[in-house]
Amino acid sequence: MKKNQFLKESDVTAESVFFMKRRQVLKALGISAAALSLPHAAHADLLSWFKGNDRPPAPAGKALEFSKPAAWQNNLPLTPADKVSGYNNFYEFGLDKADPAANAGSLKTDPWTLKISGEVAKPLTLDHDDLTRRFPLEERIYRMRCVEAWSMVVPWIGFPLHKLLALAEPTSNAKYVAFETIYAPEQMPGQQDRFIGGGLKYPYVEGLRLDEAMHPLTLMTVGVYGKALPPQNGAPVRLIVPWKYGFKGIKSIVSIKLTRERPPTTWNLAAPDEYGFYANVNPHVDHPRWSQATERFIGSGGILDVQRQPTLLFNGYADQVASLYRGLDLRENF
């Protein structure tokens, strides 16, 4: 596996920027929740920036045992841990970037059940402990690119999705993989109230082609910065597909179903002209309301330190994944 060396070490987000409270968020540009009604829920260039010297330490999540394969320990710069978990899109807990960190503590992640079903020979059910013990865990430093034209670099911990799917033995009828987030409106205020949850239809659903799901880069993620995922980052298990926009990274997964037909996906249902099924990072295909040619990398500095950088095709992973889309019109199949 080739390394992706497209960022300097000085650009990595520092761990001290990762876990932030609402009172520590400084908004350079603001927008009210009412203004975020669909289909305008994603707004480019509206970034919140974290400021202050009294930031709390990272949450005391469970320390994980994991390896650091050389192939994934590249020289990409890391986004600070407090920014990774303090600046999130997780509409089940509110629309503001700080809402998930403020509100996701209500999510109960243990016990947990993840079911693998559909076009498989051996359906599986995993519990909370299986997620961190059934498969060897490894740390992977990946770029993360939001459709809103900002980006991070994050040291995720998890296991390749293909290892889980192989245990279930997909049948010859399996062509797609459908994912579903937990539906728990008593714990997730955005599922209870359309205003809080951005008007989306819940539970949140996502999907991949089977070959995308089986790709070695596709990661079932259970940790970050050496510890179990905090709730605002999608505990206890989420999906990371580093060559796609962040909304493909479904959080708090309870169901994986292999299907014959392409499954529905939440943002494509909400605004099909703006959010495609594939959602591959592509600087040549703009969002209808903003350019995707460049992005703002979130590092350890404040708003005056933010640098724009060119967006890379497939988020810098073209050598690994471009062959998946040979012959496919990426403008039409965005």
Swiss-Prot record:
SUPFAM superfamilies: Oxidoreductase molybdopterin-binding domain (SSF56524). It is found in: Periplasm. CDD domains: YedY_like_Moco (cd02107). The gene is msrP. Predicted to be exported by the Tat system. The position of the signal peptide cleavage has not been experimentally proven. Pfam families: Oxidored_molyb. Its main location: periplasm. Mo-molybdopterin binds at N88, Y91, E92, C146, T181, N233, R238, G249, I250, K251. Its cofactor is Mo-molybdopterin. This is Protein-methionine-sulfoxide reductase catalytic subunit MsrP. HAMAP family: MsrP. InterPro entries: MsrP (IPR022867), OxRdtase_Mopterin-bd_dom (IPR000572), OxRdtase_Mopterin-bd_sf (IPR036374), TAT_signal (IPR006311). Its EC number is 1.8.5.-. The keyword Magnesium does not apply. Part of the MsrPQ system that repairs oxidized periplasmic proteins containing methionine sulfoxide residues (Met-O), using respiratory chain electrons. Thus protects these proteins from oxidative-stress damage caused by reactive species of oxygen and chlorine generated by the host defense mechanisms. MsrPQ is essential for the maintenance of envelope integrity under bleach stress, rescuing a wide series of structurally unrelated periplasmic proteins from methionine oxidation, including the primary periplasmic chaperone SurA and the lipoprotein Pal. GO terms for biological process: protein repair. Keywords: Metal-binding, Molybdenum, Oxidoreductase, Periplasm, Signal. It catalyses: L-methionyl-[protein] + a quinone + H2O = L-methionyl-(S)-S-oxide-[protein] + a quinol; L-methionyl-[protein] + a quinone + H2O = L-methionyl-(R)-S-oxide-[protein] + a quinol. One of its GO terms (molecular function) is metal ion binding. Coiled coil: none annotated. One of its GO terms (cellular component) is periplasmic space. Heterodimer of a catalytic subunit (MsrP) and a heme-binding subunit (MsrQ). Binds 1 Mo-molybdopterin (Mo-MPT) cofactor per subunit. Belongs to the MsrP family. Residues 1-44 form the signal peptide.
